[in-house]
Amino acid sequence: MVWELFTRLVDNSFLLVGPMEAFRHIFLLMEKAAFFRILSFSSFRILSAYFLSFFLALAFALFSYQHRFFENLIQPPLFLLRNLPVASFVIILLFFIGRANLSFFISFWMSFPIFYFNFLEGLKKLDQDVLEMARVFRFSPWNRFRYILIPGIYPQMLSSAKLAMGLSWKSGIAAELIGQVRNSIGYQLMDAKVSLDMGEVFAWSIIMIALSKFFELLVLYVLKKGFSKGSI
């Protein structure tokens, strides 16, 4: 295993620990009473932001598709948000909101532009002949949404859902770390770093990656089952 090989080459537990040591720390963390409370704290805020950004971005993209002025109005601030460094955004938000919900706002604003621009791109690529057919046969707004719009943006929905999930977790945990949000995964990472406990740093990192991947696969499964053929 490459990780184990590098650990043996470095041979310094203050810099790098092996996989067995990292997983030993995971089991030690799981024995602590606060472990699942910490997971719940971070997961709830990050996932709430992710799903809210998904549905709001879909609504905004649909409105922008129908009203060009709205697209021109919100594109500049969204481009700014998409390119603003997480650290700068965290510091700015600390002046306006409390630390407890910092990861929610950061995860939301990092994932919203991804969803919005991908959904809008998919809508602009819709087959105009199909849309014309829907008008001729007088599809209701709901049926147009269900049978044409959603299947039409399905590829963009999958790609953006995957990309935004990873970014939501990375930016959310980074916000917790920078903002020193207590009872969060980010705070535990910072505390382990200050204590020079690399085993715990790797343990929390593995936990974060595992949670991100688990929910990514879960969301993709739901989208593939529910949206691929407009079955909503």
Question: Can you say where each PLM-predicted feature lies in the sequence?
Answer:
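N-terminal signal-anchor transmembrane alpha helix
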Residues: 1-10
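Transmembrane alpha-helices
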Residues: 105, 109, 141-174, 215, ...
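Periplasmic/extracellular loop-to-transmembrane helix junction in inner-membrane transport proteins
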Residues: 9-51
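Short cytoplasmic-facing helical segments at TM-TM junctions of multi-pass membrane proteins
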Residues: 118-157, 189
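C-terminal transmembrane helix and the adjacent membrane-cytosol boundary/short C-terminal tail
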Residues: 68, 159, 202-232
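Generic hydrophobic transmembrane alpha-helix motif, especially the helices
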Residues: 79-114, 121
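Transmembrane-helix boundary motif in ABC transporter permease subunits
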Residues: 48-78
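Glycine-rich helix-loop "coupling/hinge" segments at transmembrane-helix boundaries
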Residues: 95, 171-208, 231-232
